[in-house]
């Protein structure tokens, strides 16, 4: 099925409040992954934990985005699969250390997986959509750095960063969405095949 993204005239404060509240998907997803599979210590664990967490984060984001964009539930699947692949690849390449640059680099890889998968669905939004994977990758790395700086115990090998990182990530991506959508009509034609 082909999907064309259409902008809704609705939005405003309700949309942005929903996008801000979507940060709750991060701690809920992290707790769900921890409860179901425990610490994320292997690429396989990263893939499974990423899919679980990504599905919950993606669902929270989709609930907010569907008010402004005519996205399908494919957003949830894209987020889950992108996070599973990105987290598994990051662990395979860099291990599970939370010290030094390893943590934000692994976050950059996971974020690139998520952002690239979501971009497939956002590409019909307009000419600014290619910035999305870059912002998500950088935001994911920043989220991990802020979580570490806030003193969260990262030895528990969480699948996703904490609330401080999630709030910052949602702010950064929300501002990016506002910039992407401002004054742009959706290009006609197919956006993605799902």
Task: Identify what each model region corresponds to.
Residues 1-194:
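Juxtamembrane/disordered regions of integral membrane proteins
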């Amino acid at each position: 099925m082909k999907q064309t993204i259409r902008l809704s005239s609705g939005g405003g404060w309700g949309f942005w409040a929903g996008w801000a509240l979507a940060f709750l998907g991060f701690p809920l997803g992290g707790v769900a992954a921890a409860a179901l599979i425990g610490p994320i210590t292997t690429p396989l664990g990263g893939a499974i934990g990423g899919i679980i967490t990504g599905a919950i984060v993606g669902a929270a984001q989709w609930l907010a985005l569907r008010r402004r964009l005519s996205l399908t539930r494919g957003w949830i699947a894209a987020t889950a699969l992108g996070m599973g692949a990105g987290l598994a690849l990051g662990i395979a390449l860099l291990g599970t250390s939370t010290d030094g640059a390893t943590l934000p680099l692994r976050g950059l890889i996971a974020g690139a997986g998520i952002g690239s998968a979501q971009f497939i669905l956002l590409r019909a939004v307009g000419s600014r959509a290619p910035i999305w994977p870059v912002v998500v990758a950088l935001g994911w790395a920043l989220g991990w750095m802020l979580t570490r700086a806030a003193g969260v115990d990262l030895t528990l090998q969480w699948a996703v960063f904490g609330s401080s990182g999630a709030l910052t990530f949602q702010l950064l991506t929300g501002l990016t969405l506002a910039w992407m959508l401002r004054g742009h009509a959706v290009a006609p034609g197919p956006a993605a095949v799902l």
